[in-house]
Amino acid sequence: MAELLACLQSISAHAKDMMALARSRGATGSRPTPTTLPHFDELLPPNLDFVRTRLQEARLPPKAIKGTLSAYESACARWKHDLEEAFDRTAHSISPHNFQRLAQLRTRLYVEQVQKWLYEVLQVPERWKAEMEKQRAHINATMGPDKTTGPGKRSRPKFHSEYTPVLELYFHFNAYPTYADRRILAEKTGMLTRQITVWFQNHRRRAKGPLPRMSPTAKIPMEEFERQLENLARKIVPVLLPPTLRRFAPGNENKSLAAASRQSAGKSSKNAKRLSELEKAQQVPRKPSENAEAGPSSLGAMLARVMHNDSVSKKKSKKAKKEKASQQNVVCDVEMRDATATKEKRRKMKKLPRAAGQPFDVPMDVERADKASRKAMKKAKKSPRAFDSRAELAFAQAAYPSPSQYAYVHSRKPSAQKPSSDSPRKDFGQLGKGRPSSNSTSSTVPPHRVSSRLNAMRPPYAFPAPYNAAAVPLTFSVASSTQFAFATDNRSFGFAERTPRKATVPAACTLIDYLISKFAGLRLLCVEQSVSSRSISLSTSESGKLAGLRTEGLTTGEASGVQTHVDSYAARRAITYVPPSAPLDCVVHNLARALQLKQVRPMVLAQPVVQPDAFAPFIARAERRARRKERKQRKALEEKQAKKDRKERQKASRSQRDSPSMDADVQSRASSVASTSSLPARKSSKKSRKSKGESAASSRATSVASSVRTPSLSSTSSRRSSGMSMPGTPRPEQDLPIMATADFNFAGDEDVTMTPDLAAQLFGEDEDGAAALGQMQYEEFSPDMLTFTSTAGGALSDMTADVNMPDLGNAYTSQQSVDDMNWTGFGLDAQNSASPGLFGDESNTGLDWLLSHNLLGDTQMSDLSYTAPTSTPSQINILGSTYACELGGSDSLGTPFNMNDWTFGLGACDDGFAGFGNNLLGGTAVAV
C-alpha cells in the first residue's frame, strides 16, 4: 500500500510539472468532454411466488405468510432503490471504460443481499414450528394433555390448586381485580382468565366482612406484600416433604440430592448416623410392623419407624439420657405437619366385655401389643418433629425449576454473573425471618419493579435459580410470529458487522476499482489547478466530487497524507449515521468539516421508537368507567334532590290550602286556657302548665306543616333536611348578634310574605277566631305566665308558646321612670328597675315588690286606684318580619286591681331593631 501511494504521488507530481511546462509555453487547457451516462441493466425483483409456495408447504398461517412476504418485498425494493441512486451518482466520475465493471458490482451487491434475506425468510417456518412445539409442551406440562370425551366436546381446563395461596394473597389486597390483573394472574398460574374470574367471584361470595377494593391505577404496597409472601412461604414450605424423608419410585432415585443433603447436614456424627439410617430405611423396603398403627399418610409412619429404631438402638446409659434430654429441649423453628392428608373418619365401637388381663382402653377384637412397642409409639408421638431448612430448600429447588424468563417482563433482568464456587453458603435457615439482606437469595421478589403491581406474583416456593432463557418456552402472549422487519444494512438486520480489513494485499478487482477512483480524483484536481475558475465550469457531479475530495484532504499540498481502508464503514459507525448511499470505499478524516459541508448526515429515525405499555388501554378504560359512573351518580343525586324539592313544594301548597283546618287546634287551646279560671288555684296551675305544654306541641306540629320557605321551629332534623343554617341561641352572658332579613336563606325564589294564616299558625288567634295582620291580638294574662324559659339548643322551638308572654321585670326598663303606676299616691316607694344584665328573677320582679309592701294581703283590691300606664310599644323580629308589642291597663281609675286586665298585643311595623332588652325567648330577642 505504501508503494502504491508513492506511485500515485509521483504520477501527480509529473502531471503537475507537465501542466506547468505547458502553461509556460502558452498552451491552454481544453474543455473536458462531458461523460456519457452508462446504461445499467434493470435489477430483477425477487421471486415472491416461490417464497409463497415454500411458506404454504410449511403450513404457516395465512396472516404470517402475508406479513412475511410484504416485509421481504419492501426490504428488497428499498435496497434496489438505494443501489440505483448511489451507482447513478458514482457513474459521473468514472471512465466509460469501467462501466461494465461498475455494472457487475451493482448486480452482485443486489443479488447477494436478496439471497441472504431469502435464506432468512425460508428459515421462518422452522422457527415457527419449533416455537409451536415449545408452546404445546408447555401447555401439556401445565394444563395436562388434551383429553376429549367426544368429537364435539371440549375438555374441562384443569384448575391448579397449588396456586391457590397466590390468589388468596392477592385477594388480601384487592377482591376486585381488573381485567389486566386477571390476565396476568392467568399467565402466572397457567390457567384461563375465566377460571381466575370465577375463583374471585366464589371467594367474594364466601368472604365475610368488608372486602378490599383498590382503584385500577393504585399499586399494592410492596413491603406488606413481601411480608405476607414470606409468611405464606413459611406456611407452605413445611408441607413439602424433604428429600431425606421422601421415598423415590424405582428408577427415579436422585443421588445428587442425597449427597448434597448428607454434605450439608453431616457436620456432626449424630446427624451423619441418622442420615445413614434414613438411607437404609429408604433403600430396603421394610414390612409394616404389627404394632404400628396405620396413619393418614406415609409421613407419620416413617417418622414413627425412625423414632422406634432410635429408641431400640440406643442403650440406656447416662450419655444416651443426656442426648435424649437435649433432643427434647431443642426448639424447632417450624413444626412439621402433614397438611395434605385427609382426616380419617373413625367409627365408634361399642364396648364389649373384655377378656381376662385385657386393659380397659383396648377393644375386644384388637390384639394386645407388647409393652415395648407401645412405649416406643408413645415416645414417637411425644417427640418434636423438626424442620430441616437446608434439606427443604434443596428439595424445593429440585422439585420446582427455575422461574420463567417472563417473570421479569416488567422488571430488570437479573445479572448473568454466576456465583463463584468458593463463595460462602447462604444461611437459608433465616428464610422468612425478618427482611432479607441485599446479598441474600432467599427473597422471592425480583427487584426494580417498574410498571405493574403484579411483577412479583410468583409461587412462594419458586426459589431463585440461575437465569436460563432456554429452560422455559415462550408463551402465547410474548411470541409474535407474525411480525417481521428487514433493514437495509447488515448491522440493523442482525448479521455479522462489517469490520475494516487489516493491511493486507487486496483483491485484484478491488485494487483496480480503487485505482480508477483515485485517478478520477487526481484528474479533477489537475483540472482545478490547470485552469482558472472562470475559464471553465464543472458539472454538478464533478463539483460535488471535488468538494468531497477537499473534505477528505486530497488537496495539492496534502496528497501525501491519504489513508485508505479498502472495505470500511468504520468512520460511519463511529457515530450513528445514515446507511451509506453507495457500498463503496469511503473514509472521513475531518468529521467536523464533513458535517459542516453536509457530506455526512446524522441518522434521524423516521418514527421514534416507543415501548408500548400493555396496561395503558386497560387503565384508560377503567378511568373512563370511573368518570362515567361518577356522572351517573351525580345525575341520580340531582334527580333525587329535584324530586324532593317538588314534593316539598306540593306539601307547602297543600298546607296553605288546608289552613282553615288549623282553627280547631287554636280554639281548643283557647278553651283549655279559659277553663283554668274556674278550677282551684293548685289544679288551675297544673292545668295551665299542661295546656301550655299541649299548646306548645300543637304549635310545633303546625309549624312543621308550614311552607318549605318557612324554617321549621320544632325539630333539628327538619332544619337539616331544609338545608338552612339557623342562628344559635346565645347564652345569658353573651350579647345578641345583629341579624337582618338577609341572614335567613330560604329555598324559594321570593321572600317570605306574612299572611294572616301564617300569623295565626305562629302566634295563635283571639277568642273570636278572627286574626288580622294589622290588628291587635289580646289574650288573658295570668300570674303563671310570668316565668319564662329559654331553650339551650339555640332553636326557635318555643317561640310560638312564649311570644305572647311578656316579662313584667323588663316592662319599663326602656323608660326613664318606673313610677308610671303612680305608686307614690299610695305612700309607697317607687319600684326598683331590674338590672338589664341579669336574667334569673327579673320576670318576677313586679310580684316580689308587691308582696314586700303587703299589697296583696291586707289591702283590698277594690280600694286600689291607679293611673293607667302609657302604652309601651316594643318590637319583635321573627323570621325576617317585625311585630309591635304593647303593654297597658284599663283606662278607669276606680276599677279594682285585676291582673287579667293587663293585656298586650302584636302588630305589624317596619323592619328594624330598636332598644333591645336581655330577655331570651327561644333564641329570639324581644325588645320591651
UniProtKB/Swiss-Prot annotation:
InterPro entries given in the database record: AalphaY_mating_typ-dep-bd-dom (IPR007689), HD (IPR001356), Homeobox_CS (IPR017970), Homeodomain-like_sf (IPR009057)
Compositionally skewed regions (Basic residues) per UniProt: 344-353
Disulphide bridges, residue numbers: none
Biased composition (Basic and acidic residues): 635-657
DNA-binding region, residues: 152-211
Sample GO molecular function, one term: DNA binding
Annotated region described as Disordered, given as residue ranges: 255-296, 310-329, 340-359, 406-451, 626-736
Location of this chain's protein in the cell: Nucleus
Composition bias, Low complexity: 668-682, 694-728
Alphabetical list of PROSITE patterns matching this protein: HOMEOBOX_1, HOMEOBOX_2
GO biological process, one term: sexual reproduction
Protein name: Mating-type protein A-alpha Y4
